[in-house]
Amino acid sequence: MGAAPCASKVRLRVRADQVESVTLRIWWNNAEYRWFMRRVEGGFYEYEMSIPEQPGLLWYYFIAKDKEGNTWYLGNANDGMGGEGVVTRSEPPAFQVTVYDPAYRTPEWMRDGLMMQIMVDRFNNAGGTDMKNLPRGSYYHAHWDDDPALVINDKRGSNSANDFFGGNLKGIEEKLDYIRSMGVTVLYFNPIFEANSNHKYNTGDYMKIDPSFGTEQDFKELCAAAKKKGIRIILDGVFSHTGSDSVYFDRYGNYGGKGAYCDPQSPYRSWYNFNDWPDNYESWWGFNTLPNVNEEDPSYKKFIITGRNSVLAHWMRAGAGGWRLDVADELPMDFLRALRKREKGIDPDSALIGEVWEDPTKKMAYGELRCYCTGDTVDAVMNYPLREAVLDFMRCRINARDFVRRVESMRENQPKQFFYSQMNLLGSHDRPRALAVLADVGNMEPERKYRYPIELDKKDYDHGKRRLIAAWNLICALPGMPCIYYGDEAGLYAMSDPYCRGTYPWGREDQELLEAFRACDKRRMKSHALRTGDMRLTAVGEDVVLVERSIRGGKDVFGKAAANEHRAVAVNRSGESRWIEYGGKIVEIAGESALILK
């Protein structure tokens, strides 16, 4: 049954010939209910169920008794992915119903948009570099095309992350025409606030742009220039922890000694949990450079969310069009709800995207089953499950039927407005470059100390490139907001962090790959059907996935007026040609490619 709005009515029907009775077993809010189903014509049993009035997850399956007194169950498949039920003699997994707020809305521009993720330091430099803007102990690379440095600096295997290349906000503004030429309408930046690392996930001051990136005025000017070109800017909000080298913690005394580590009377003392002040404190995954914050602390909540000039409000007034929330599944649900309420109060058309790596409809975090698509937290998440499905399919780890099943499970369990707003990515700063993965030359995510700059020969590069183009066509044919990780479109390939965070190869781009991305992006942006049309997903044999998108009756899936249209894309993951029947004809799809069908 999938997702349903609160307080709606749903009629459940099950065909069960030659049984005496069928019972519907339901779980809601830690309570169990059983209802006898009514027998109707055709051997069916049915029950009209009232969906609860509050958002959450509802679970159910059917219990049948035959004339001999035997008990049979009809429930979810063992993989829990929904679809057609399975009959068993033992208790099965339950079907899921995602109960969501009927007032749930996501911005239209998300489902219509195309995103690019950019690490500011690695994209483009404008105006040169100045050593005085670098954090203490950091350095600039001598050459833009150097590999990022890997210096393991502790027993946990973390990277020192103190090497910089000089990318800045003015550098991004300088390249807005290029960005727009790729069809991009949304830019997501990794953190840009002051911090002593190149990745900036250890915030030093939430109210300041990092000096190596520019100034607040530079940010405002970038937002204004981007807006003129139809591009919105999303910021990275790191709110589960701060840096130890920060205004708020100040372990090293670099910020005046008023932080929680230095001063027991610090105004920030209640933000942190000390087991034995000052050296023994809770930190993110045990990294003492990332002290955890208590998100429910009133003063912290006021500083980040509710205050008149909170972090959230300040940067949205400066031009940000929304936020991507770092480790969203580690933030308390009430914190997320408060954040959503304030953000939408400032700008109802802003976006809130969560970093959730697993199924966002039922993520188990800290002993709590959480659902992020009921309308009270985020608009969408980074769609890592789709990334895994696409890459697994293209590398022959799963077949076409498996791929279709994974995507249909997402569609079934997610509200439509969430499903069509998902951030659909192939690469990110936390994963190896997609081309490297698709080249299939070995493990691209070994333990950090075993990572190194790889060199692909022409054969392996071309193999990964063919697969990448096909994979990107598949991403752009599916509902959701496609996201380019900067440089993927230009031919960058690398192992995971830090090498996946290399610089954009200006002047060394793979022009053929660029044009393939650009053509795909433009095709999507010109087609209502590819953005908000209905979807039919078909597995054709083991190797071909056929995606059909259509608008009928003059309206898209959200009821918005749109011209009738039908688009189809077939992707063949095999290394050899495959033939499919389409439109009454037999058509050939070359190996490891996508075919645009008319």
At which residue positions do the language-model features occur?
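Glycan-association/targeting regions that enable binding to alpha-glucans and other polysaccharides
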Residues: 1-112, 116-117
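Carbohydrate-binding surface patches
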Residues: 11, 537-583
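C-terminal beta-strand-rich structural cap/linker in extracellular carbohydrate-active enzymes
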Residues: 16, 587-598
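Hydrophobic faces of well-ordered beta-strands that scaffold small-molecule active sites
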Residues: 114-116, 187-189, 233-235, 323, ...
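Conserved, mostly hydrophobic/aromatic
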Residues: 118, 179, 189, 206, ...
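Substrate-binding/active-site clefts of carbohydrate-active enzymes
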Residues: 120-186, 192-318, 339-346, 362
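Aromatic/acidic polysaccharide-binding cleft in carbohydrate-active enzymes
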Residues: 121, 366-367, 423-456, 472-510
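Active-site-proximal helices and loops of the catalytic beta/alpha 8
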Residues: 223-232, 240-241, 246-257, 311, ...
